[in-house]
Swiss-Prot record:
Cofactor note: Binds one cofactor per subunit.
Oligomer status and interactors: Homodecamer. The basic unit is a homodimer, organized into a ring of giving a pentamer of five homodimers.
Catalytic activity, as annotated: L-arginine + H(+) = agmatine + CO2
A GO cellular component entry from the record: cytosol
Gene3D superfamilies in UniProt: 3.40.50.2300, Aspartate Aminotransferase, domain 1, Orn/Lys/Arg decarboxylase, C-terminal domain, Type I PLP-dependent aspartate aminotransferase-like (Major domain)
Primary gene name: adiA
Short name of one Pfam family: OKR_DC_1
Modified residue annotations for N6-(pyridoxal phosphate)lysine: 386
Stated induction or repression of this protein's expression: Under conditions of acidic pH, anaerobiosis and rich medium. Forms an operon with downstream adiY but not (further) downstream adiC.
Compartment(s): Cytoplasm
Name of the protein described by the UniProt record: Biodegradative arginine decarboxylase
Biological source species: Escherichia coli (strain K12)
Domain of life: Bacteria
Group of enzyme by EC: lyase
Disulfide bond positions: none
């Protein structure tokens, strides 16, 4: 246990009260309580701001000075941002303290200890009792139960075979593995025979209580804890919602797990096509694509569904937000899509934090309270491990029940099909803890901190861009509004100079309005989408607002390679866009290093520093290509290639339309199982049917889905693969990753259904 004692700067240490505080600190130490002492408000505030976990906050204040009242309020406020139920003690003279405090302040203090009347041992005992009660309610249901069960130190005769880690200690490699991860991981790795903990698959005991807790915090009627990632969550929902007789509506900007769900179920898809801007940034599906008339027309015209014209789709899925951080007004989208289907699925794998900050109001699935829901059944899937705080593979399915609801027993059959009978309890517990971290005040505090850091970074980049361009030079600029308006005053500001509080709390600063050039989404409806502040893209120079390449530019691939050499890994790179995810683990020092590294790139780029000095590994590996080049020379060569070939335009064309679907994804997959497939080189792809999806990274979205036809030799799909092949040949070391292709002797091949 740990106590923070904050003493007033107005209290002299050598007074009788000061000596009494010293005796209390000694008494606490004798009860194995760690005592941290602070002798000023600033020091105490700094300790709490550093996320120091404490079990009790004590003030040695007489409350006679006006500043003491304000200090106490601020310190308790800071404490409660992340540690809401920590007991607060006021140590003081009874008559003076009570007489000086108002009602609001009295309500913030849990206990008053009269330091001159009660003994130090008595006050210490009261504090230990309060801290014990606090700790008993601190941990969420499953994690608490696991810790208690681990303390039993049982002799187990069941799986897993390592028996609490003992098995690993019997060889040197196993011992090293055991010591590296620590004993608690292995002690809590238990089989499903521990009935006192309940069951993940039956949702009983501590597992069931954990899911009820998650449902309350995330605003669902029911939540399902998943340990096979959101890929498993998505497949589970699809397996529960559809069969091979169903028509379903799918966002073309979908994760590959959605296609896998189509393979498993055999359902017949029609697709909603999202928008893209000049940079290849993924925008929203426009409302006209979601209109019931539009979707029924697609059903009647698609080769896969035309025999089911007029049939009501059993399911509809939308990716929210897009990978680039474009968030739908989910309320508006739901109002449209519920006219088509009674089951809506928002794949919010990268967006599980939205409920906890008002800046995202109306732009996520689990809006408001479950009891107020009246409409279709709504699913949301969250990767708690992505931008919350959980171990990899941790995920949640959240459900608001309405029309088309699937009862527990039926849904659980699909859940068990995709779960495991041997879950790693550490993943389950991390899901539980991720929920508890978002409960109460801490959810707002944690999300606000991330938004604050992201906005600070954006403004720092905007100021540098402004300064460099004023000097006739170049720099990277953040992809966001260049001018914002305070809706209360009507005053406008350059983004770089806008009040931070305006940018971090007012949603309109991030809403995409029609006619704004910065976002580049033509004809976007008002109040349809907003940019997520924490998904930060920076733009390298080289592309004009009309989408045409300028005379000179800096290819983003070269910048990303520079960053990688300095230990910085962006989440996504296109021709002129580099994207960074701000999360709860990002610090000011981390993004400060990023800014410095970008400035370093500019300095060396402008100086045309030889590649042998700044990227020696590249020169060593490919001396024939790069030996005599400077970094600016390479950038110019890359830019000239981009200007001539413009692969981004080919990719935008590929994503703006739909290839002909010859067979369903399931039928294409069956061809793989039957070995009725062959690898086909790029020049022979025209007219062939893809057996697997082709997914360029970035953006990680299917350009072609299983069962679709490549089209003729000039189709955007074939043209784009041809341009990638050319890029890889010209710039070894900068190859693109394209899932679903195989490169043989420098030639792209794709697995196709045999003709």
């Amino acid at each position: 246990m740990k106590v923070l004692i904050v003493e007033s700067e107005f209290l002299h240490q050598d007074t009788w009260v000061g000596n009494a505080v010293e005796r209390l600190a000694d008494a606490l130490s004798q009860q194995n309580v760690t005592v941290i002492k602070s002798t000023s408000f600033d020091d105490g505030f700094a300790i709490l701001s550093s996320n120091e976990a404490i079990d009790c906050l004590m003030f040695s204040y007489q409350m006679e000075h006006p500043d003491e009242h304000q200090n106490v309020r601020q310190l308790i406020g800071k404490l409660h941002e992340r540690q809401q139920n920590v007991p607060v003690f006021l140590l003081g003279d009874r008559e003076k303290a009570l007489a000086a405090m108002d009602r609001d302040l009295l309500e913030l203090v849990d206990e008053f200890a009269w330091i001159l009347e009660d003994t130090a041992d008595f006050i210490a005992g009261r504090a230990v009792a309060a801290m014990t009660r606090y700790r008993q309610q601190l941990l969420p249901p499953l994690f608490s139960a696991l810790m208690k069960y681990s303390d039993i130190h049982e002799y187990s005769w069941a799986a897993p075979g390592h028996q609490g880690g003992v098995g690993f200690t019997k060889t040197p490699a196993g011992r090293f593995y055991h010591d590296y991860y620590g004993e608690n991981l292995f002690r809590t790795d238990m089989g499903i025979e521990r009935t006192s903990l309940g069951s993940l698959l039956d949702h009983t005991g501590a597992f069931g209580e954990s899911e009820k807790y998650a449902a309350r915090v995330f605003g669902a009627d029911r939540s399902w804890s998943v340990v096979v990632g959101t890929s498993g969550s998505n497949r589970t929902i699809m397996q529960a919602c559809m069969t091979d007789n169903d028509v379903v509506v799918v966002d073309r900007n979908c994760h590959k797990s959605i296609e896998q769900g189509l393979m498993l179920t055999g359902a017949k898809p029609v697709y909603m096509v999202p928008s893209r801007n000049r940079y290849g940034i993924i925008g929203p599906i426009y409302p006209q694509e979601m209109q019931p008339e539009t979707l029924q027309k697609k059903i009647s015209e698609s080769p896969l569904t035309k025999d089911k014209a007029g049939q009501k789709p059993s399911y509809c899925v939308v990716t929210n937000c897009t990978y680039d951080g474009v968030c739908y007004n989910a309320k508006e989208a739901q109002d449209l899509l519920e006219k088509t289907s009674d089951r809506l699925h928002f794949d919010e794998a990268w967006y599980g934090y939205a409920r906890f900050n008002p800046i995202y109001a109306d732009h996520y699935a689990m809006r408001g309270e479950p009891g107020d829901h009246n409409g279709p059944t709504v699913f949301a899937t969250h990767s708690t491990h992505k931008l919350l705080n959980a171990l990899s593979q941790a995920s949640y399915i959240h459900v608001r029940e309405g029309r088309g609801a699937i009862n527990f027993s039926r849904f659980n059959q699909a859940y068990m099909m995709h779960a495991t009978t041997s879950p790693l309890y550490a993943i389950c517990a991390s899901n539980d803890v991720a929920v508890s971290m978002m409960d109460g005040n801490s959810g707002l505090s944690l999300t606000q901190e991330v938004i604050d850091e992201a906005v600070d970074f954006r403004q720092a980049m905007a100021r540098l861009y402004k300064e460099f361009t004023a000097d006739g030079s170049w720099f990277f600029k953040p992809w966001n509004k260049e001018v914002v308006t305070d809706p209360q005053t009507g005053k406008t500001y350059d983004f770089a100079d806008a009040p931070t509080k305006l940018l971090t709390t007012v949603q309109d600063c991030w809403v995409m309005h029609p006619g704004e050039s910065w976002h580049g989404f033509k004809d976007i409806p008002d109040n349809w989408s907003m940019l997520d502040p924490i998904k930060v893209s920076i733009l390298a120079p080289g592309m004009g607002e009309d989408g045409e390449l300028e005379e000179t530019g800096v290819p983003a691939a070269l910048v990303t390679a520079w960053l990688g050499r300095h230990g910085i890994v962006p989440t996504r790179t296109t021709d002129f866009q580099i994207m960074f995810l701000f999360s709860m683990g990002v610090t000011r020092g981390k993004w400060g290093t990023l800014v410095n590294t970008l400035c370093s790139f500019k300095r060396h780029y402008d100086a045309n520093t030889p590649l042998a000095q700044v990227m020696p590994e590249l020169v060593e590996q490919y001396p024939d290509t790069y030996a005599n080049m400077g970094i600016h020379d390479l950038g110019d060569t890359m830019f000239a290639w981009l200007k001539e070939n413009n692969p981004g335009a080919r990719l935008n064309e590929a994503y703006s339309g739909l290839p002909v679907a010859e067979v369903t994804p399931r039928e294409a997959y069956n061809a793989i199982v039957d070995n009725n497939v062959e690898l086909v080189s790029i020049e022979n792809l025209p007219g062939r049917i893809a057996a697997n999806s082709v997914i360029p990274y970035p953006p990680g979205i299917p350009m072609l889905l299983s069962g679709e036809n490549f089209g003729d030799k000039n189709s955007p799909q074939v043209s784009y693969l041809r341009s990638l092949q050319s890029w890889d040949h010209h710039f070894p070391g900068f190859e693109h990753e394209t899932e679903g292709t195989e490169i043989i002797d420098g030639i792209y091949h794709v697995m196709c259904v045999k003709a």
